[in-house]
Amino acid sequence: MNIIEQIEKEEIARLTANKTIPAFAPGDTVIVNVNVVEGNRKRVQAYEGVVIAKRNRGLNSSFIVRKISSGEGVERTFQLYSPLIAGIEVKRRGDVRRAKLYYLRERSGKSARIKEKLVMKAKPAAVAAE
């Protein structure tokens, strides 16, 4: 491991010390709580939408969230380890077969829907043996 990788790993550990980042993937509906500073006031703003892309590059990791606001599509790019992000909450898991969902930009309404990923729960060993 070279010096740059070591420094990036330490920086990621420092930035994630007080917050947890859940595992999410493209197709998931997430709520990103963003710290917004307006003058001398600081507040948390929730931004909810579908993750259409995720870029895993260590400290430079980012993701794009798309939502429909007043009939217009709005996309916002977030840095995963940014101090402006107060928290990320996964609201719904999406079942998609692509890593980048840029095709959703041309779609609207029912054709832009994403199937929900259903997680099968493992049966206890006692029930499975019978």
Swiss-Prot record:
A UniProt-annotated Pfam family: Ribosomal_L19
Annotated signal sequence range: none
A single GO BP: translation
Keyword Ribosomal protein: yes
Alphabetic keyword roster: Ribonucleoprotein, Ribosomal protein
InterPro entries: Ribosomal_bL19 (IPR001857), Ribosomal_bL19_CS (IPR018257), Ribosomal_bL19_sf (IPR038657), Translation_prot_SH3-like_sf (IPR008991)
SUPFAM superfamilies documented for this protein: Translation proteins SH3-like domain (SSF50104)
GO molecular function, a single term: structural constituent of ribosome
A GO cellular component annotation in the UniProt record: cytosolic large ribosomal subunit
Keyword Ribosomal protein listed: yes
Gene3D superfamilies for this protein: 2.30.30.790
Its biological purpose: This protein is located at the 30S-50S ribosomal subunit interface and may play a role in the structure and function of the aminoacyl-tRNA binding site.
Listed PANTHER family: LARGE RIBOSOMAL SUBUNIT PROTEIN BL19M, RIBOSOMAL PROTEIN L19
Family stated for the protein in its record: Belongs to the bacterial ribosomal protein bL19 family.
Full protein name: Large ribosomal subunit protein bL19
